[in-house]
From Swiss-Prot:
Protein origin, superkingdom: Eukaryota
Molecular function (Gene Ontology), one example: oxygen binding
Cell cycle in keyword set: no
Residues holding heme b: 63, 92
Role description: Involved in oxygen transport from the lung to the various peripheral tissues.
Protein name per its UniProtKB record: Hemoglobin subunit beta-2
Assigned GO CC terms: blood microparticle; haptoglobin-hemoglobin complex; hemoglobin complex
Transmembrane segments: none
Length: 146
């Protein structure tokens, strides 16, 4: 994947302002609200009975932070995202049996959350750059499935 200097700048400049624990929790919680079948991977997290329970669940919040922290690794390795996520791809395929479509869903929810948190700063160019990034990350995570 080729990244232009502008794309890299847009991504890194917005990411520097992202509250990873908050955005991670919001993203994972909203994904489970919007796509309830994804909750089956997190049944051991306790109360997932509705939007308030999901978004306030400490385990959802902690895992959301972990997911977004991992996503942040992609920014450090934009030219080698596949290798960066090779072990996570294996884990999600071999042990967790996650449908790779869920990676795309999570990426799309992240875009929505970022847009909501950053308003006018989340310009069409920034949106396009992040959409490209979440697609690259989703593809890298699905790599082991191919």
């Amino acid at each position: 994947v080729h990244w232009s200097a502008e794309e890299k700048q847009l991504i890194t400049s917005l990411w520097a302002k992202v509250d990873v624990p908050e955005v991670g929790a919001a993203t994972l919680g909203k994904m489970m609200v919007m796509y309830p079948w994804t909750q089956r991977f997190f049944a051991h997290f306790g109360n997932l009975s509705g939007p308030s329970a999901l978004c306030g669940n400490p385990q959802v919040r902690a895992h959301g932070k972990k997911v977004l922290t991992s996503f942040g690794e992609a920014l450090k390795h934009l030219d080698n995202v596949k290798e960066t996520f090779a072990k996570l791809s294996e884990l999600h395929f071999d042990k967790l049996h996650v449908d790779p479509e869920n990676f795309k869903l999570l990426g799309n929810v992240l875009i929505i959350v970022l847009a909501g948190h950053h308003g006018k700063e989340f310009t069409p160019s920034t949106h396009a750059s992040f959409q490209k990034l979440v697609n690259v990350v989703a593809h890298a995570l699905a790599r082991r499935y191919h």
